[in-house]
Curated annotation (Swiss-Prot):
Keywords: ATP-binding, Ligase, Magnesium, Metal-binding, Nucleotide-binding, Tricarboxylic acid cycle. This is Succinate--CoA ligase [ADP-forming] subunit beta. It comes from Exiguobacterium sp. (strain ATCC BAA-1283 / AT1b). Residues 9-244 form the ATP-grasp domain. ATP binds at K46, G53, R54, G55, E99, S102, E107. PROSITE patterns: ATP_GRASP, SUCCINYL_COA_LIG_3. Belongs to the succinate/malate CoA ligase beta subunit family.
Amino acid sequence: MNIHEYQAKELLREFGVAVPTGYPAFTVEEAVAAAAKLDGEVKVVKAQIHAGGRGKAGGVKLAKTDEEVKQYASEILGKTLVTHQTGPEGKVVQRLYIEEGSAIDQEFYLGLVLDRSIGRIVIMGSSEGGMDIEEVAEHTPEKIHKEIVDPVVGLRPFQARRLAFKMEVPTKLVNEFSDMVMKLYKVYVETDCTIAEINPLVTTKDGNVIALDAKLNFDSNALYRHSDILALRDTTEEDPREVEASKHDLSYIALDGNIGCLVNGAGLAMATMDIIKHYGAEPANFLDVGGGATKEKVTEAFKLILSDDQVKGIFVNIFGGIMKCDIIAEGIVAATKEIGLDLPLVVRLEGTNVDAGKRILDESGLAITTANSMADGAEKIAALVR
Protein backbone atom coordinates (compact mmCIF):
# COMPACT_ATOMS: atom_id res chain seq x y z
CA MET A 1 0.00 0.00 0.00
CA ASN A 2 1.25 3.48 -0.86
CA ILE A 3 0.65 6.73 0.98
CA HIS A 4 1.15 10.38 0.04
CA GLU A 5 4.31 12.36 0.70
CA TYR A 6 2.74 14.49 3.42
CA GLN A 7 1.48 11.37 5.22
CA ALA A 8 4.92 9.76 4.96
CA LYS A 9 6.56 12.87 6.39
CA GLU A 10 4.15 12.97 9.30
CA LEU A 11 5.03 9.35 10.06
CA LEU A 12 8.76 10.09 9.79
CA ARG A 13 8.30 13.05 12.14
CA GLU A 14 6.78 10.71 14.74
CA PHE A 15 9.99 8.67 14.62
CA GLY A 16 12.18 11.74 15.07
CA VAL A 17 13.24 12.24 11.45
CA ALA A 18 13.76 15.92 10.58
CA VAL A 19 11.32 17.10 7.89
CA PRO A 20 10.29 20.61 6.80
CA THR A 21 7.10 22.04 8.26
CA GLY A 22 4.14 21.71 5.94
CA TYR A 23 0.37 21.30 5.70
CA PRO A 24 -1.91 19.40 3.30
CA ALA A 25 -4.48 21.35 1.30
CA PHE A 26 -7.51 20.18 -0.66
CA THR A 27 -8.59 23.56 -2.03
CA VAL A 28 -6.89 26.74 -3.21
CA GLU A 29 -8.15 28.54 -0.11
CA GLU A 30 -6.64 25.90 2.17
CA ALA A 31 -3.35 26.19 0.28
CA VAL A 32 -3.19 29.96 0.86
CA ALA A 33 -4.09 29.51 4.54
CA ALA A 34 -1.41 26.84 4.93
CA ALA A 35 1.23 29.08 3.38
CA ALA A 36 0.33 31.86 5.82
CA LYS A 37 1.25 29.60 8.73
CA LEU A 38 4.74 28.89 7.39
CA ASP A 39 7.91 30.86 8.08
CA GLY A 40 10.46 31.82 5.46
CA GLU A 41 10.32 33.66 2.17
CA VAL A 42 9.84 30.61 -0.05
CA LYS A 43 6.91 28.18 0.07
CA VAL A 44 6.79 24.98 -1.96
CA VAL A 45 3.51 23.93 -3.59
CA LYS A 46 3.59 20.17 -4.19
CA ALA A 47 1.12 17.96 -6.01
CA GLN A 48 0.24 14.83 -4.02
CA ILE A 49 -0.09 11.73 -6.18
CA HIS A 50 1.16 8.17 -5.81
CA ALA A 51 3.95 8.56 -8.36
CA GLY A 52 7.41 10.01 -8.69
CA GLY A 53 8.65 12.53 -11.23
CA ARG A 54 6.21 15.24 -10.11
CA GLY A 55 8.73 18.06 -10.44
CA LYS A 56 9.52 17.35 -14.08
CA ALA A 57 5.79 17.17 -14.83
CA GLY A 58 5.11 20.60 -13.35
CA GLY A 59 3.74 19.33 -10.05
CA VAL A 60 6.21 21.15 -7.76
CA LYS A 61 6.45 24.95 -7.72
CA LEU A 62 8.37 27.47 -5.60
CA ALA A 63 6.27 30.44 -4.49
CA LYS A 64 7.62 33.66 -3.00
CA THR A 65 4.30 35.39 -2.36
CA ASP A 66 0.80 34.43 -1.26
CA GLU A 67 -0.41 35.38 -4.72
CA GLU A 68 2.00 32.90 -6.30
CA VAL A 69 0.82 30.20 -3.87
CA LYS A 70 -2.75 30.89 -5.00
CA GLN A 71 -1.73 30.85 -8.66
CA TYR A 72 0.23 27.60 -8.46
CA ALA A 73 -2.41 25.88 -6.33
CA SER A 74 -5.05 26.83 -8.91
CA GLU A 75 -2.89 25.50 -11.74
CA ILE A 76 -1.97 22.20 -10.07
CA LEU A 77 -5.23 21.17 -8.37
CA GLY A 78 -7.31 19.17 -10.82
CA LYS A 79 -4.43 18.90 -13.27
CA THR A 80 -3.56 15.52 -14.76
CA LEU A 81 0.12 14.87 -14.14
CA VAL A 82 1.85 12.49 -16.53
CA THR A 83 5.17 11.15 -15.25
CA HIS A 84 7.37 8.17 -16.02
CA GLN A 85 5.59 6.32 -13.20
CA THR A 86 1.95 7.17 -13.95
CA GLY A 87 1.74 5.80 -17.47
CA PRO A 88 0.34 7.84 -20.38
CA GLU A 89 -3.05 8.26 -18.69
CA GLY A 90 -1.51 10.22 -15.81
CA LYS A 91 -3.04 10.95 -12.40
CA VAL A 92 -5.39 13.75 -11.40
CA VAL A 93 -4.12 15.93 -8.55
CA GLN A 94 -6.73 16.07 -5.79
CA ARG A 95 -4.61 17.34 -2.91
CA LEU A 96 -1.55 19.52 -2.33
CA TYR A 97 1.19 19.83 0.25
CA ILE A 98 2.32 23.35 1.13
CA GLU A 99 5.78 23.26 2.68
CA GLU A 100 8.39 25.73 3.85
CA GLY A 101 11.38 26.15 1.56
CA SER A 102 14.86 24.91 2.49
CA ALA A 103 18.26 26.46 1.79
CA ILE A 104 19.79 23.39 0.14
CA ASP A 105 23.54 22.85 0.23
CA GLN A 106 23.83 19.22 -0.99
CA GLU A 107 21.36 16.55 -2.10
CA PHE A 108 21.64 12.82 -1.38
CA TYR A 109 19.58 9.67 -1.91
CA LEU A 110 18.72 7.27 0.91
CA GLY A 111 16.53 4.19 0.57
CA LEU A 112 15.73 0.89 2.24
CA VAL A 113 14.40 -2.14 0.38
CA LEU A 114 14.18 -5.88 0.88
CA ASP A 115 16.57 -7.76 -1.39
CA ARG A 116 14.72 -11.03 -1.87
CA SER A 117 17.70 -12.68 -3.55
CA ILE A 118 19.63 -12.62 -0.26
CA GLY A 119 16.75 -12.32 2.19
CA ARG A 120 18.11 -9.14 3.75
CA ILE A 121 17.17 -5.50 4.12
CA VAL A 122 19.54 -3.39 2.05
CA ILE A 123 20.23 0.28 2.70
CA MET A 124 21.24 2.23 -0.39
CA GLY A 125 22.78 5.66 -0.47
CA SER A 126 24.09 7.93 -3.18
CA SER A 127 25.51 11.40 -3.56
CA GLU A 128 23.26 11.74 -6.63
CA GLY A 129 20.18 12.89 -4.75
CA GLY A 130 17.11 14.31 -6.45
CA MET A 131 17.46 11.96 -9.44
CA ASP A 132 15.69 8.71 -10.23
CA ILE A 133 17.81 6.06 -8.56
CA GLU A 134 17.13 3.77 -11.54
CA GLU A 135 18.93 6.24 -13.81
CA VAL A 136 21.88 6.44 -11.43
CA ALA A 137 22.04 2.64 -11.29
CA GLU A 138 22.05 2.46 -15.09
CA HIS A 139 24.54 5.21 -15.90
CA THR A 140 26.77 5.57 -12.81
CA PRO A 141 26.27 2.45 -10.65
CA GLU A 142 29.52 3.14 -8.82
CA LYS A 143 27.79 6.08 -7.14
CA ILE A 144 25.33 3.80 -5.33
CA HIS A 145 26.60 2.45 -2.02
CA LYS A 146 24.99 -0.33 -0.02
CA GLU A 147 24.90 -1.73 3.49
CA ILE A 148 23.34 -5.15 4.09
CA VAL A 149 21.52 -5.60 7.40
CA ASP A 150 21.94 -8.78 9.43
CA PRO A 151 18.41 -9.61 10.63
CA VAL A 152 19.75 -11.13 13.86
CA VAL A 153 21.38 -7.93 15.14
CA GLY A 154 19.70 -5.31 12.96
CA LEU A 155 21.35 -2.20 11.57
CA ARG A 156 24.44 -1.22 13.55
CA PRO A 157 25.51 2.42 14.01
CA PHE A 158 28.91 1.75 12.43
CA GLN A 159 27.14 0.72 9.21
CA ALA A 160 25.24 4.00 9.09
CA ARG A 161 28.49 5.94 9.59
CA ARG A 162 30.29 3.85 7.00
CA LEU A 163 27.54 4.61 4.49
CA ALA A 164 27.86 8.32 5.28
CA PHE A 165 31.59 8.27 4.56
CA LYS A 166 31.06 6.36 1.30
CA MET A 167 28.51 8.97 0.23
CA GLU A 168 30.92 11.77 1.13
CA VAL A 169 28.57 13.40 3.60
CA PRO A 170 30.31 16.45 5.17
CA THR A 171 32.30 15.25 8.18
CA LYS A 172 30.58 17.59 10.63
CA LEU A 173 27.19 16.14 9.62
CA VAL A 174 28.10 12.43 9.66
CA ASN A 175 26.61 11.85 13.12
CA GLU A 176 23.37 13.64 12.24
CA PHE A 177 23.14 11.75 8.95
CA SER A 178 23.84 8.42 10.67
CA ASP A 179 21.12 9.16 13.22
CA MET A 180 18.64 9.71 10.37
CA VAL A 181 19.64 6.40 8.78
CA MET A 182 19.03 4.58 12.07
CA LYS A 183 15.63 6.24 12.47
CA LEU A 184 14.58 5.45 8.92
CA TYR A 185 15.54 1.81 9.51
CA LYS A 186 13.33 1.82 12.62
CA VAL A 187 10.44 3.19 10.55
CA TYR A 188 10.99 0.49 7.93
CA VAL A 189 10.96 -2.39 10.42
CA GLU A 190 8.30 -1.24 12.87
CA THR A 191 5.75 -0.24 10.22
CA ASP A 192 6.36 -3.22 7.90
CA CYS A 193 7.54 -1.16 4.93
CA THR A 194 8.50 -2.63 1.59
CA ILE A 195 10.16 0.62 0.53
CA ALA A 196 11.36 3.57 2.61
CA GLU A 197 12.95 6.27 0.49
CA ILE A 198 14.16 9.82 1.05
CA ASN A 199 15.02 11.50 -2.23
CA PRO A 200 16.41 13.99 -1.80
CA LEU A 201 17.84 13.91 1.67
CA VAL A 202 19.52 17.30 1.94
CA THR A 203 22.10 19.09 3.98
CA THR A 204 21.21 22.75 4.44
CA LYS A 205 23.37 25.84 4.46
CA ASP A 206 22.75 26.22 8.20
CA GLY A 207 24.12 22.72 8.85
CA ASN A 208 21.07 20.47 9.20
CA VAL A 209 20.11 17.15 7.63
CA ILE A 210 16.51 17.11 6.38
CA ALA A 211 14.23 14.67 4.54
CA LEU A 212 13.03 16.90 1.72
CA ASP A 213 10.88 14.21 0.09
CA ALA A 214 9.65 10.87 1.39
CA LYS A 215 8.17 7.71 -0.04
CA LEU A 216 6.86 4.87 2.12
CA ASN A 217 5.22 1.72 0.77
CA PHE A 218 3.83 -0.92 3.10
CA ASP A 219 3.35 -4.67 3.00
CA SER A 220 -0.39 -5.11 2.49
CA ASN A 221 -0.24 -8.47 4.26
CA ALA A 222 0.87 -6.72 7.47
CA LEU A 223 -1.72 -3.94 7.53
CA TYR A 224 -3.96 -5.88 9.92
CA ARG A 225 -1.58 -4.80 12.69
CA HIS A 226 -1.30 -1.18 11.54
CA SER A 227 -4.82 0.23 11.58
CA ASP A 228 -3.41 3.76 11.81
CA ILE A 229 -1.51 3.28 8.55
CA LEU A 230 -4.42 1.54 6.83
CA ALA A 231 -6.52 4.62 7.62
CA LEU A 232 -4.15 6.64 5.39
CA ARG A 233 -5.10 4.67 2.29
CA ASP A 234 -6.28 6.82 -0.62
CA THR A 235 -8.32 4.55 -2.87
CA THR A 236 -8.77 7.32 -5.45
CA GLU A 237 -5.09 6.83 -6.32
CA GLU A 238 -5.59 3.12 -7.02
CA ASP A 239 -7.09 1.19 -9.92
CA PRO A 240 -10.84 0.95 -9.08
CA ARG A 241 -10.81 -2.71 -10.11
CA GLU A 242 -7.99 -3.48 -7.69
CA VAL A 243 -9.87 -1.69 -4.92
CA GLU A 244 -13.00 -3.73 -5.68
CA ALA A 245 -10.93 -6.93 -5.76
CA SER A 246 -9.51 -6.25 -2.30
CA LYS A 247 -13.06 -6.05 -0.91
CA HIS A 248 -13.60 -9.67 -1.94
CA ASP A 249 -10.15 -10.90 -0.90
CA LEU A 250 -9.05 -11.28 -4.52
CA SER A 251 -5.57 -10.44 -5.80
CA TYR A 252 -6.05 -8.53 -9.05
CA ILE A 253 -3.65 -6.55 -11.22
CA ALA A 254 -4.77 -5.11 -14.55
CA LEU A 255 -2.56 -5.68 -17.60
CA ASP A 256 -2.74 -4.65 -21.25
CA GLY A 257 -3.83 -7.86 -23.00
CA ASN A 258 -7.20 -9.29 -24.06
CA ILE A 259 -7.40 -12.68 -22.31
CA GLY A 260 -8.84 -12.57 -18.81
CA CYS A 261 -7.25 -15.03 -16.38
CA LEU A 262 -8.86 -16.60 -13.33
CA VAL A 263 -6.41 -18.78 -11.43
CA ASN A 264 -5.79 -20.05 -7.90
CA GLY A 265 -2.29 -19.43 -6.57
CA ALA A 266 0.16 -16.68 -7.49
CA GLY A 267 2.73 -19.04 -8.98
CA LEU A 268 0.18 -20.78 -11.19
CA ALA A 269 -1.22 -17.38 -12.19
CA MET A 270 2.20 -16.19 -13.37
CA ALA A 271 2.80 -19.46 -15.21
CA THR A 272 -0.61 -19.08 -16.86
CA MET A 273 0.26 -15.60 -18.10
CA ASP A 274 3.56 -16.89 -19.46
CA ILE A 275 1.97 -19.75 -21.40
CA ILE A 276 -0.71 -17.45 -22.84
CA LYS A 277 2.09 -15.28 -24.23
CA HIS A 278 3.83 -18.43 -25.48
CA TYR A 279 0.82 -19.13 -27.69
CA GLY A 280 0.86 -15.63 -29.15
CA ALA A 281 -1.76 -13.92 -27.00
CA GLU A 282 -1.60 -11.39 -24.15
CA PRO A 283 -3.05 -11.70 -20.63
CA ALA A 284 -5.45 -8.95 -19.55
CA ASN A 285 -4.88 -9.41 -15.85
CA PHE A 286 -3.35 -11.27 -12.96
CA LEU A 287 -6.16 -12.66 -10.82
CA ASP A 288 -5.60 -15.06 -7.94
CA VAL A 289 -8.80 -16.25 -6.24
CA GLY A 290 -6.80 -17.93 -3.48
CA GLY A 291 -7.43 -21.24 -1.78
CA GLY A 292 -10.84 -20.56 -0.26
CA ALA A 293 -12.92 -19.57 -3.25
CA THR A 294 -16.71 -19.79 -3.06
CA LYS A 295 -19.35 -19.50 -5.78
CA GLU A 296 -19.85 -15.86 -4.77
CA LYS A 297 -16.12 -15.17 -4.95
CA VAL A 298 -15.83 -16.71 -8.41
CA THR A 299 -18.78 -14.60 -9.59
CA GLU A 300 -17.09 -11.43 -8.33
CA ALA A 301 -13.88 -12.51 -10.07
CA PHE A 302 -15.75 -12.87 -13.38
CA LYS A 303 -17.31 -9.43 -12.92
CA LEU A 304 -13.87 -7.94 -12.33
CA ILE A 305 -12.46 -9.54 -15.46
CA LEU A 306 -15.39 -8.36 -17.57
CA SER A 307 -15.12 -4.79 -16.26
CA ASP A 308 -12.12 -4.51 -18.58
CA ASP A 309 -13.39 -3.65 -22.07
CA GLN A 310 -10.20 -5.08 -23.60
CA VAL A 311 -11.11 -8.65 -22.56
CA LYS A 312 -12.12 -10.84 -25.53
CA GLY A 313 -11.96 -14.23 -23.82
CA ILE A 314 -11.44 -15.86 -20.40
CA PHE A 315 -9.13 -18.69 -19.36
CA VAL A 316 -9.88 -20.36 -16.01
CA ASN A 317 -6.95 -22.46 -14.79
CA ILE A 318 -7.56 -24.22 -11.48
CA PHE A 319 -5.53 -26.78 -9.59
CA GLY A 320 -7.75 -28.08 -6.82
CA GLY A 321 -5.84 -28.71 -3.64
CA ILE A 322 -7.44 -26.94 -0.71
CA MET A 323 -10.04 -25.66 -3.15
CA LYS A 324 -12.29 -28.28 -4.72
CA CYS A 325 -12.87 -28.37 -8.46
CA ASP A 326 -16.61 -28.99 -8.12
CA ILE A 327 -17.02 -25.80 -6.06
CA ILE A 328 -15.13 -23.84 -8.70
CA ALA A 329 -17.23 -25.43 -11.46
CA GLU A 330 -20.45 -24.45 -9.67
CA GLY A 331 -19.12 -20.91 -9.34
CA ILE A 332 -18.21 -20.76 -13.03
CA VAL A 333 -21.66 -21.96 -14.09
CA ALA A 334 -23.44 -19.58 -11.70
CA ALA A 335 -21.30 -16.62 -12.76
CA THR A 336 -21.75 -17.38 -16.47
CA LYS A 337 -25.53 -17.52 -16.08
CA GLU A 338 -25.77 -14.43 -13.85
CA ILE A 339 -23.57 -12.26 -16.05
CA GLY A 340 -24.83 -13.62 -19.36
CA LEU A 341 -21.30 -14.26 -20.60
CA ASP A 342 -21.01 -14.08 -24.37
CA LEU A 343 -17.22 -14.32 -24.67
CA PRO A 344 -15.16 -17.46 -25.30
CA LEU A 345 -14.53 -19.32 -22.03
CA VAL A 346 -11.93 -22.06 -21.63
CA VAL A 347 -11.70 -23.98 -18.35
CA ARG A 348 -8.94 -26.28 -17.21
CA LEU A 349 -9.57 -28.13 -13.93
CA GLU A 350 -7.22 -30.53 -12.18
CA GLY A 351 -7.01 -31.93 -8.66
CA THR A 352 -9.56 -32.57 -5.91
CA ASN A 353 -13.01 -33.59 -7.21
CA VAL A 354 -11.94 -32.88 -10.79
CA ASP A 355 -14.34 -35.45 -12.29
CA ALA A 356 -17.30 -33.94 -10.45
CA GLY A 357 -16.20 -30.49 -11.58
CA LYS A 358 -15.97 -31.49 -15.23
CA ARG A 359 -19.37 -33.17 -15.03
CA ILE A 360 -20.94 -29.97 -13.71
CA LEU A 361 -19.48 -28.03 -16.64
CA ASP A 362 -20.54 -30.63 -19.20
CA GLU A 363 -24.11 -30.80 -17.88
CA SER A 364 -24.53 -27.02 -17.62
CA GLY A 365 -25.53 -26.63 -21.26
CA LEU A 366 -23.30 -23.56 -21.49
CA ALA A 367 -20.74 -22.79 -24.20
CA ILE A 368 -17.74 -23.71 -22.07
CA THR A 369 -14.64 -25.18 -23.70
CA THR A 370 -12.77 -27.60 -21.43
CA ALA A 371 -9.04 -28.26 -21.58
CA ASN A 372 -6.98 -31.24 -20.49
CA SER A 373 -3.86 -29.29 -19.56
CA MET A 374 -2.62 -25.76 -19.03
CA ALA A 375 -0.94 -25.74 -22.44
CA ASP A 376 -4.09 -27.11 -24.09
CA GLY A 377 -6.19 -24.42 -22.45
CA ALA A 378 -3.84 -21.58 -23.36
CA GLU A 379 -3.67 -22.74 -26.96
CA LYS A 380 -7.47 -22.99 -27.19
CA ILE A 381 -8.23 -19.55 -25.73
CA ALA A 382 -5.53 -17.93 -27.87
CA ALA A 383 -7.10 -19.47 -30.98
CA LEU A 384 -10.64 -18.45 -29.96
CA VAL A 385 -9.83 -14.75 -29.54
CA ARG A 386 -7.88 -14.35 -32.78
